[in-house]
Amino acid sequence: MSGSTGERAFADIITSIRYWVIHSITIPSLFIAGWSFVSTGLAYDVFGSPRPNEYFTESRQGIPLITGRFDSLEQLDEFSRSF
């Protein structure tokens, strides 16, 4: 190696106590935050996706498949009217 960039070696980083003190707090915190974001239903509201019990309503029980190649717009309009 001709020069040094001044960065610490990866082995030095992962064997340091400071690294594990910081990451033993942040990694579980991120996991808990993500789990609560999904389990409370906030993820459905933020991203606008339907909740698991909203995929199939009483009036619409079939799977919305587009089967025709040339009449796909009509099938899509038909499907969107059922909302």
Curated annotation (Swiss-Prot):
Question: So what does this one do?
Answer: This b-type cytochrome is tightly associated with the reaction center of photosystem II (PSII). PSII is a light-driven water:plastoquinone oxidoreductase that uses light energy to abstract electrons from H(2)O, generating O(2) and a proton gradient subsequently used for ATP formation. It consists of a core antenna complex that captures photons, and an electron transfer chain that converts photonic excitation into a charge separation.
Matching PROSITE patterns: CYTOCHROME_B559 (PS00537)
* Quaternary assembly: Heterodimer of an alpha subunit and a beta subunit. PSII is composed of 1 copy each of membrane proteins PsbA, PsbB, PsbC, PsbD, PsbE, PsbF, PsbH, PsbI, PsbJ, PsbK, PsbL, PsbM, PsbT, PsbX, PsbY, PsbZ, Psb30/Ycf12, at least 3 peripheral proteins of the oxygen-evolving complex and a large number of cofactors. It forms dimeric complexes.
According to its record, what are the GO cellular component terms? chloroplast thylakoid membrane; photosystem II reaction center
Query: Example GO molecular function term?
Result: electron transfer activity
GTP-binding as a keyword of this entry, yes or no, is: no
Which cell locations does it reside in? Plastid, Chloroplast thylakoid membrane
Provide the membrane topology annotation: Single-pass membrane protein
> What GO biological process terms are annotated to this protein in UniProt?
photosynthetic electron transport chain
**In terms of domain of life, where is this protein from?**
Eukaryota
State where heme binds. Answer: H23
- Main subcellular localization, coarse class? plastid
- Which keywords fit this entry according to its UniProt record? Chloroplast, Electron transport, Heme, Iron, Membrane, Metal-binding, Photosynthesis, Photosystem II, Plastid, Thylakoid, Transmembrane, Transmembrane helix, Transport
Necessary cofactors: heme b
- What residue ranges are annotated as transmembrane? 21-35
Annotated cofactor note: With its partner (PsbF) binds heme. PSII binds additional chlorophylls, carotenoids and specific lipids.
Q: Which organism is it from?
A: Nymphaea alba
InterPro entries according to UniProt: PSII_cyt_b559_asu (IPR006217), PSII_cyt_b559_asu_sf (IPR037025), PSII_cyt_b559_CS (IPR006216), PSII_cyt_b559_N (IPR013081), PSII_cytb559_asu_lum (IPR013082)
**Similarity section:** Belongs to the PsbE/PsbF family.
Q: Which PANTHER family match?
A: CYTOCHROME B559 SUBUNIT BETA-RELATED
Q: What is this protein called?
A: Cytochrome b559 subunit alpha
